[in-house]
Amino acid sequence: MDSGSKKKVLVAGATGYIGKAVVAELLDRDYIVFAIVRKENQLEYSDQSNLNVISLEIGKNSDWTKQLPKIDIIISCLASRSGCEHDANFVDYSLNSDLLYFALKIELQHFILLSAICIQKPKLAFQRAKLRFNNTLMSSGLRYSIVLPTAFFKSLSGQVNRIKNGKSFLVFGTGKRTSSLPISEIDLAKYIVNCIGSEESWNKSLPVGGPGPAVTPIDQAEMLFKIFDKPKKIKHISPRFFDFVLILLFPVSFFSQKIKDKLELIKIGKYYAEESMLFYDADADAYDASKTPQFGENLLYDYYCSLRDDPDKIPDMGSQKLFS
């Protein structure tokens, strides 16, 4: 484990699922951390001398150089909550661009970006926004590391309450078309912080998943039925469900921003029902678990067990929830 050597690290998105874990990992390694929070948010950590929780408005009109000491490293864990076009353009592109503007102004040492492996096949608004900023960062002249994780444990927890309550597990098609190498927030945070001192991670895009084997939706169902000791009930839904809803809503979307946003959420659901969260081999036109770099030691099965043992830890999926 590398030591922070009193380097100053600014974490944007410090209140998020991965951002909180990154802050904790940095503190464990003795970095001096500046965690950005919005004025309306609260970030609660145990009292640590190396932690500075600051309220800043992200934007080019805000002169951060007057509010912050010289920062050595920026880690951006910013991500839009909904994935809708206006939200994605603002958070995934514009706010990150403002961070980059600040980084160039202070001659930053290293910019580490948490992105997503799904940008390999961009079909959605948030993927295009992420990819647009990734390209901007790569051409900026700054040292960068762009981390492309697979699925988070939290992302594969949307049906835990269904199984806990004796309901069926819902899959699209056979439930075996897609797979992922899910990674825990703790392991991903370690990987992100490792990028600071690992020259092999500099100026690269870095796909990363958790320890294998790859997991399909059917595999998730089998785990949950076993862990919660519930009878196996799997309901198969035709992937055409998404196409039907898209056709139904498309004409109305021209007249309603709310419907347009709903349309984008349906597209997101369709994407994840059809695409694996693994390294995409463009030459073979196929996802490949064997070519997806693996990191960490935490397993999805053990995570599900922890949710059984402490139901209060079952995450609230919010706007990301597809199944109720």
Residue ranges and their predicted role:
Residues I18, I74, L188, I192, ...:
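Non-catalytic, hydrophobic alpha-helical segments
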Residues D2, K6-R29:
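N-terminal Rossmann NAD(P)H-binding glycine-rich loop of SDR-like oxidoreductase domains
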